């Protein structure tokens, strides 16, 4: 809308990005990956489309401990971005498996209170398990 010719927005599934291999400088994602049932595929496809040296910049929720079944299986909590959160360790493992380097996962503990209020009556203890986080990674140079 502002006439920038160096930015492109595309609509597609996060597990199957409608972008050519090695063509993107950066991928930005805000609170979406936790909703995917196949997070490894998300990170693998992000790696595929990034140019060597390309960056992944994510803001999402991560679990600081394994989620109890009642949180994982609650549809309200799943759709509220709580029930599908991967642990910090699992997120790092998936990024490494996809091929990323220079991985940083920076939890924001101050988000716990807000997350506990997302689904009134249901997410009261969600902040005990889930926090917002900045996730950064780089596709290595060839």
Locate the predicted segments by residue:
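Short, conserved SAM-binding/catalytic segment
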Residues: 1-7
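Helix-to-beta-strand junctions that scaffold the AdoMet/dcAdoMet cofactor pocket
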Residues: 3, 35-37, 50-52
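A short acidic, Gly/Pro-enriched loop at the edge of an enzyme's catalytic core
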Residues: 5, 15-26
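A short SAM/SAH-binding and catalytic strip from SAM-dependent methyltransferases
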Residues: 14, 25-38
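Class I S-adenosylmethionine-dependent transferase superfamily signal
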Residues: 31, 45-47, 95
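A short glycine-rich, Lys/Arg-flanked "PGG" loop and its adjoining helix->strand segment in the class I
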Residues: 40-55
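Short, glycine-/aromatic-enriched active-site segment of Class I SAM-dependent methyltransferases
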Residues: 62-82
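C-terminal lobe and adjacent flexible extensions of AdoMet/dcAdoMet transferase-like proteins
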Residues: 94-142
């Amino acid at each position: 809308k502002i006439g920038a010719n160096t930015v492109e927005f595309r609509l597609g599934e996060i597990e199957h990005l409608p972008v050519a291999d090695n063509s993107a400088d950066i991928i930005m994602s805000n609170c979406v990956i936790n909703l995917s049932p196949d997070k490894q595929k998300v990170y693998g496809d992000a790696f595929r489309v990034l140019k060597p040296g390309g960056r992944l910049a994510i803001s999402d929720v991560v679990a600081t401990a394994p989620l109890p079944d009642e949180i994982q299986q609650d549809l309200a909590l799943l759709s509220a971005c709580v029930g599908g959160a991967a642990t910090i360790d699992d997120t790092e493992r998936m990024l490494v498996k996809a091929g990323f380097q220079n991985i940083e996962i920076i939890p924001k503990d101050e988000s716990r209170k807000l997350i506990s209020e997302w689904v009134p009556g249901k997410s009261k203890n969600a902040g005990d398990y889930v926090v917002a986080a900045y996730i950064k990674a780089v596709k290595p140079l060839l």
